[in-house]
């Protein structure tokens, strides 16, 4: 019985080492995103609820295709902290290595407007960002009929909420 535990312990240790090595390699490759392989439209204003300007950074691949599929990306931070800059490397990676137009979105935080923003407003921001993308992404060579959403942590929650509200998106 004791011997089996040692084998699992060793296997677990080796698995963690392998995973950490893969993560380090992925981080290095993300840090080497070639800026000549995408065009960046920084701080594109997409809404101004209650006077707070909401922006997104739009990364467009430069491979010469007529249009590209689109990924709308929401950052994490517990709806309280951070902005889209924490997703810059991931956005550039998707644009350069997967040929997506990436919309890296800022949304209101719970701490904005003297802590008066609520979670429903943040969810509406996320949904509004996707609606804006569908209406405007052709200006950035994005295909409005091929839009996906993703996010990290709180951003993943917002992505799930957008998907759940999908029946409110137009069918095209």
Question: PLM ranges: what are they?
Answer:
Residues 67-76:
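Short beta-strand element of the alpha/beta-hydrolase
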Residues 27-66:
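N-terminal cap/lid segment of alpha/beta-hydrolase-fold proteins
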Residues 2-12:
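Bacterial N-terminal signal peptides that target proteins for export
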Residues 128-172:
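Primarily recognizes the serine-hydrolase "nucleophile elbow" in alpha/beta-hydrolase
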Residues 57-60, 67, 81-93:
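N-terminal carbohydrate-binding/catalytic regions of secreted carbohydrate-active enzymes
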Residues 47, 83-84, 90, 103-144:
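Catalytic nucleophile-loop/oxyanion-hole region of alpha/beta-hydrolase
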Residues 70, 99-106:
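A fold-wide structural signal in alpha/beta-hydrolase
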Residues 19-22:
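C-terminal motif of bacterial Sec signal peptides marking the signal peptidase cleavage site
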């Amino acid at each position: 019985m004791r011997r089996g535990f040692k084998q699992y312990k060793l296997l677990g240790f080796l698995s963690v080492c392998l995973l950490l090595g893969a993560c380090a390699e992925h981080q290095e490759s993300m840090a080497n995103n070639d800026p000549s392989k995408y065009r960046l439209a920084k701080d594109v204003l997409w809404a101004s609820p209650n006077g707070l300007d909401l922006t997104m950074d739009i990364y467009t691949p430069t491979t010469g295709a007529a249009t590209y599929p689109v990924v709308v990306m929401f950052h994490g931070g517990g709806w309280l902290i951070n902005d889209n800059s924490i997703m810059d490397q991931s956005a550039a990676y998707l644009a350069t290595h997967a040929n997506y137009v990436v919309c890296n979105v800022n949304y209101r935080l719970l701490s904005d407007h003297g802590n008066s923003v609520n979670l429903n407003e943040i969810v509406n921001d996320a949904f509004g960002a996707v609606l804006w993308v569908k209406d405007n992404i052709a200006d950035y060579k994005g295909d409005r009929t091929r839009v996906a959403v993703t996010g990290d942590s709180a951003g993943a929650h917002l992505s799930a909420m957008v998907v759940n509200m999908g029946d409110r998106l137009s069918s095209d």
